[in-house]
Regions:
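Residue-level "hotspot" positions that anchor or transmit function at local structural transition points
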Residues: 61, 105, 149-153
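Amphipathic alpha-helical recognition patches that constitute DNA-binding helices
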Residues: 18, 22, 112, 172
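Structural signature of alpha-solenoid helical repeat scaffolds
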Residues: 15, 101, 146-149
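Short linear motifs at protein or domain termini
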Residues: 1-65
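C-terminal all-alpha effector/ligand-binding and dimerization domain
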Residues: 134-199
C-alpha cells in the first residue's frame, strides 16, 4: 500500500475508486523511460562482455567497427580541428616517437592519439561511441602487445594520419586511418595464426 501511495503522490498512478489504480500519462512515459534504460544497460553489458574477450573473431569485429568510425573521425578532424589542436597533435606524436618504450607508455599514447582525433571531429556521438570501444584497458594493452610481437611500428601509422589531418585533406586523413586500422587487423590475424588459434 505504501508503495502505491508513493506512486500516486509522484503522479505516476491514479486510484479509480475501489477498482484499483491505472498509470497516468506521466506514469506511462516514466515506465517507457525505465524500459529504455533497462535495454541500454543490457546492451552495454553485452558489449562490455565482448570487449573483454580475446577471441580472434571478436577482436576482428571490434576493429572492423573501429575502422568505420575512425575513418570518419579522421575525415572530420581534417575539416574541423583548430590550428592549436593540429599543432598539439603533431607535437604529441613527434615527442612520443623518441620517448615510448614500455607497453603501458605506448598504450597511453595510442589512447591519447585516437582520443584527440575523436575530439577534433566535433561529433559527440562519434566520440562517445569510439571512447566506449577504445577505452577498455585490457583490450587496448592486448592489441599493443600483439602489434609489438608482430614487429609493428605503431607510430609510423600515426605520423601518416597526423600529416593528412594537419594538411587538411579529409580524403587522405580517412585513407590513412583506414590503412592504420587495417594494419592492426592484419597484425591480429597473423598473431592468431601463429598461435594456431585460427586456421
Amino acid at each position: 500500500g505504501r508503495m502505491l501511495r508513493k506512486m500516486d503522490f509522484k503522479n505516476l498512478s491514479r486510484r479509480i475508486g475501489y477498482q484499483g489504480r491505472v498509470l497516468t500519462d506521466y506514469g506511462r512515459v516514466y515506465l517507457q523511460e525505465l524500459e529504455n534504460k533497462r535495454y541500454k544497460n543490457k546492451f552495454g553489458i553485452e558489449l562490455l562482455n565482448i570487449l573483454e574477450n580475446n577471441t580472434y573473431e571478436e577482436l576482428r569485429e571490434i576493429l572492423e567497427v573501429r575502422k568505420i568510425l575512425e575513418k570518419e573521425s579522421a575525415r572530420l578532424a581534417a575539416l574541423n580541428a583548430t590550428e592549436e589542436e593540429l599543432i598539439f597533435l603533431k607535437e604529441n606524436v613527434n615527442r612520443s616517437i623518441s620517448l615510448l618504450e614500455s607497453e603501458q607508455e605506448i598504450a597511453r599514447h595510442d589512447l591519447s592519439f585516437h582520443d584527440m582525433i575523436a575530439d577534433m571531429s566535433r561529433n559527440k556521438v562519434l566520440r562517445s561511441t569510439l571512447n566506449f570501444l577504445i577505452k577498455s584497458k585490457k583490450l587496448h594493452l592486448l592489441l599493443i602487445r600483439i602489434r609489438q610481437e608482430m614487429g609493428a611500428r605503431i607510430l609510423v601509422d600515426h605520423v601518416k594520419v597526423v600529416n593528412a589531418i594537419c594538411g587538411r585533406v579529409p580524403k587522405d586523413a580517412e585513407t590513412a586511418m583506414e590503412e592504420h586500422i587495417e594494419t592492426v587487423i592484419d597484425d591480429v590475424k597473423n598473431y592468431f595464426k601463429e598461435q594456431q588459434k585460427i586456421v
